Regions:
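N-terminal helix-rich module
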Residues: 1, 9-39, 43, 51, ...
Length: 213
């Protein structure tokens, strides 16, 4: 009987640590999803022969707002009167490819005026993220905070372009992205950041890695 009681006491004592580990694991899983989205974009660009653009926003915080939205768009011919058939790949990040400036609403795969289609995405505004106070911050080259909006585009030839802001894409030909993008996935408790921060490091090759600290 004493042994049973001791086991019960030890199990109860372990609950807080197990709960913390579970929440940290959820944040890590979110970081994996974000990292894989960039790898998917790089792979699709080479495999499909089309430009692939990731639109990202995270102006929110642990308390709420947009905790992190990442959408993968593929450049495609969308108009029937084009020289190429509808659905044909568009291989350039700049003109004549037109990218959406804002994230698509749930259930939407097209954007007005854009020559691109939404093919995948990661939305960190779910019930679990809200409950566990998980959110992301985006840091561009030079340590500049870009949570209000940023865009990264991969071409089939291996070039990567990047632009920041929420006013729309502005990929300039001949000026490929240099440096790295960092997306930190963290969590809070009572509004105070706690636990392990998972940082998704995105170089211009698109070969992401996750740093935990």
């Amino acid at each position: 009987m004493v042994v049973v009681i001791l086991i019960g006491v030890l199990a109860v004592m372990a609950i807080p640590a197990m709960t913390t580990a579970q929440i940290d694991r959820r944040a890590y899983n979110d970081a994996i999803l974000v990292a894989e989205l960039f790898r998917e974009a790089r792979t699709r660009a080479m495999g499909r022969g089309s430009a692939e653009m990731i639109l990202m926003t995270s102006p929110g915080s642990a308390a709420g707002g947009d905790r992190g939205t990442f959408q993968l768009w593929e450049g495609q011919v969308m108009a029937a009167l084009s020289i190429l058939p509808v659905g044909s790949p568009m291989s350039t990040c700049g003109f004549p490819t037109v990218w959406p400036a804002l994230a698509a609403t749930p259930g939407t795969v097209l954007a007005a005026g854009a020559t691109a289609q939404l093919v995948d995405g990661v939305n960190l505004n779910g019930t679990i993220e809200s409950q566990d106070q998980i959110w992301t911050t985006i840091t561009g080259p030079g340590g500049v905070n870009m949570s209000s909006g940023a865009y990264m585009c991969f071409t089939p030839l291996g070039r990567t372009y990047f632009t920041a802001g929420n006013g729309g894409t502005n990929f300039v030909s001949g000026t490929p992205f240099l440096g790295e993008l960092q997306i930190s996935v963290q969590r809070a408790l009572g509004g105070v950041q706690v636990g392990i921060t998972r940082t998704v490091v995105v170089p211009n090759s698109g070969a992401t890695r996750i740093v935990s600290k």
